[in-house]
């Protein structure tokens, strides 16, 4: 059973290995502090707790997973957030990614399609004191227009194409970080919305995520 400290070392090691693709050999200090502050074992089922600090995805029920810690840290880093930001997360899952983001920004709105997971995550986040996170059960493809525009959006499930509603809900020069692709593996992308509503797309590296589900699904 690995420790929290070993997980953090593993994240830095992975960053060094993938620096060719991510463009730097280490992740932002603030991101690493957030990863250090959030107890991953609180966000996994009891039977998975011995593996909570492995640098690997873990099943959380309902056919969903909690992402590999390195990928959580990398996507958080790529969002390039500031303390005053309001962020949207699509795909709450266990609430772990939202908890990490909450350490770095003013407010996190997070959407989960599966009601059971949303309720569990909401209760967990409240119990652990993450008061700046708000959870909604909805189809994340369509975002959260009532709270838009956002300073950044993160999608933690793979979409076959870039969801236009999410682009529409970004502020100018804000980023959308998401895995893109209908099959596996997918590509982790950073999509930046420009002042003229055009987008700049940057490929980071290959990843493997569960698919984004909801009414928008392509048969």
UniProtKB/Swiss-Prot annotation:
PROSITE patterns registered for this protein in UniProt: PCMT
Annotated catalysed reactions: [protein]-L-isoaspartate + S-adenosyl-L-methionine = [protein]-L-isoaspartate alpha-methyl ester + S-adenosyl-L-homocysteine
Matches recorded under InterPro entries: PCMT, SAM-dependent_MTases_sf
Gene Ontology terms describing biological process: methylation; protein modification process; protein repair
Matching HAMAP family: PIMT
Family (UniProt): Belongs to the methyltransferase superfamily. L-isoaspartyl/D-aspartyl protein methyltransferase family.
Protein name: Protein-L-isoaspartate O-methyltransferase 2
